[in-house]
Structures are given as C-alpha cells and as structure tokens.
Design a protein with these regions (language model features):
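A transmembrane-helix-recognition feature enriched in membrane-embedded lipid enzymes
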Residues: 1-51, 100-101
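Short, basic/glycine-rich phosphate-binding loops at helix/coil junctions
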Residues: 18-19, 100-105, 190, 194-195
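Conserved H-X4-D acyltransferase segment
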Residues: 35-88
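Short, basic, glycine/proline-bearing loop/turn elements
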Residues: 37-39, 60-61, 104-111, 142
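Residue-level detector of anion-binding/catalytic polar loops
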Residues: 49, 85, 108, 134, ...
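Short acidic-hydrophobic, aromatic-tinged amphipathic segments that line or gate anion-handling sites
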Residues: 52, 108-111, 202
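Membrane-embedded segments
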Residues: 73-124
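Non-catalytic C-terminal accessory region of glycerolipid acyltransferases
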Residues: 120-248
Length: 248
C-alpha cells in the first residue's frame, strides 16, 4: 500500500512542480510566494502535521540540515520566513523543464564532480546573500538510509569560512516516515518535527564536526516521539518556542 501511495504522490508532485514553474515563469517577482503555496499544498495532500521547536535566527544567512527525504525541502519552504536559496546537485538543474525549479528562483546548482566549481558557487552564494536570501544546504550531500548522519562534506565549511557566514543548524525528524525514496514508500498523515538550534561558533576550527554531533544527538533522542523533553544539544536555548501547523 505504501508503494501505491508513493506512486500517487510522485505523480502529484511532478504535476505540481510543473504548475509552480509556470507561475514563477509568468510572474518573476512572486517566486517566494508561489513556492510557499506549493509547499502548503504538498502538506495538504500528504496530510502531515508540523511542530517547530526553537526559532529561526534572524542573523543567520545559512542554514544546514540533515537530509532524509524530499519532504525536508517542502517543509522548510513552507515554514521558514526567509527566502531560501538551496544548494542542489547540478544534475537536477539539467532535467528538462523540472530543472527550472532550480534556475528560475535562483537556487544554486553545484557540480560535485568538479572541485573547481566551488569558486563559482562562492560567487553565487555571495550574490544571494546580498539580495537578502538565506542559503540552505545539506552538508551530508545526499539522503541517507539509516539514522546515522553521513560525514559532512567540506563544502559547507569552505563556503562559511570564506564568506564569514552565520550558520544555524536545523534538525528535521519524521520526514522519511512521510516519504521514503529509498524504499519507495509513502504514508499519508504523520508528524514532522523541526528543531532550530543556536547559531554555530564558526571560530572553532572543529565547528562542522561538533555541529554534526549535536544534530546527531537530536536524532538519537527521537524527538518527534517525545515533544515534552528536549535533548541536551538544545537545552541551552534561552527560550523554546513551539508552534504546531496542522493539516487543516
């Protein structure tokens, strides 16, 4: 049954991407608005709920996230107040028509097979930040199968330190239970939890690995199953704000 649901959802997803691309193409100034509406319709279709713990830091110009499912992007497009510019694989941008979801709203496509492409990416990141965008990236580089975070790629560290960015980690829980691309399975209804951690101290030379460890702590606590207790990695927040977004 889960595979049938996945087929139904992927058909819906692709069609909805065509629709949002069409609207972005005809009205260049409203890309963010259309993307947020699109993300809400994904939630309405899959019928999941979102709980937010912590608060997006207005000073952050980059967020780094764990990657479990394509729903990770959908959730953040709906709830994050800033206009996100995602760093994505160049292969996606090359897909006919679908690739416009990267190029039209000025996301950043990176060629992971070419280390020299990082120079171009740095220029594009700088441009997006100058235009009040917030960079979003998955330092793992790809979706993982298990519950352990993959090693964080050095690209996030290079971009952050070269451009002196302020980085906020975000942990997503429960998205793979909604849509699991590895096992090609979807579940309508479910709960997603988004945990905003404090800004990272990027003056620490080991900040990337320490951030990975903190994010892993959140995952290990299975926070989406126990919303009343925060893991140690998040107890230093001065104030915890929890918002719930229902399927209604």
């Amino acid at each position: 049954m889960g595979k049938i649901k996945a087929i139904i959802y992927y058909i819906y997803f692709v069609l909805s991407v065509f629709v949002v691309i069409f609207f972005m193409a005809i009205k260049n100034s409203s890309h963010r608005h259309f993307r947020r509406i699109w993300a809400k319709f994904q939630r309405y279709f899959l019928r999941y709920k979102i709980e937010i713990i912590g608060t997006p830091d207005e000073n952050a110009n980059m967020i780094i996230l764990n990657h479990q499912s394509i729903i990770d992007i959908v959730v953040m497009e709906e709830i994050h107040k800033a206009n996100l510019s995602w760093i994505a694989k160049k292969e996606i941008a090359r897909i006919p028509i679908i690739g416009k979801i990267i190029t039209l709203p000025k996301m950043i496509a990176i060629d992971r097979s070419n280390p020299r492409d990082l120079v171009r990416v740095l220029h594009e990141v700088e441009d997006r930040i100058e235009n009040n965008r917030v960079i979003a990236m998955f330092p793992e580089g790809t979706r993982r199968k298990g519950n352990k975070l993959l090693k964080f790629q050095t690209g996030a560290k290079v971009i952050t330190e070269k451009l002196k960015l302020k980085v906020q980690p975000v942990v997503l829980l429960g998205t793979r239970e909604i849509l699991d691309s590895h096992n090609f399975c979807a579940n309508f209804f479910g709960n997603v939890k988004v945990v905003y951690l404090p800004l990272v101290d990027t003056t620490d030379k080991d900040w990337l690995e320490k951030t990975r460890s903190k994010m892993q702590e959140i995952l290990d606590e299975n926070l989406y199953e126990d919303s009343n207790e925060l893991p140690d990695a998040n107890k230093n927040l001065n104030q915890i704000k929890t918002d719930k977004i229902s399927e209604k």
